[in-house]
């Protein structure tokens, strides 16, 4: 399984999570929780917890999830009843692992509180053409993610952010930020 082969790797950078955390604080004054989907070994939720000083957990579909704190084994297409309207933000750099991206984002939006934020990381590696060369199921572009979020009821795209740090092999690296309104 690809996840087990890459278990010691972390896709995201701590500096970028710090930047995103500062951004979240400007939009949501009181942050109590969040969820990171597809976290492999859970570094993203550790960093968000550190910079936002709140409870963050992650999901990972692989059975390796149980080896890491604050990570549950879970298919991120599914949501629990107690997650509905419960989270201040949801972050993922693993959306290319979705078998149905519009459905997945729609499910995640149900879990956001009013004004909650959906943060999707994208790179050239997430592009549909690149995903055909990897083990990833799907792919997306900045434009397609923005359109998909905009088409979800009660969701708007509020920003696109370029990170301070990125891997040199990727020609582009960005975050699309959606926000729920009721």
Question: How should each PLM-predicted stretch be described?
Answer:
Residues 102-117:
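A short glycine-rich, Lys/Arg-flanked "PGG" loop and its adjoining helix->strand segment in the class I
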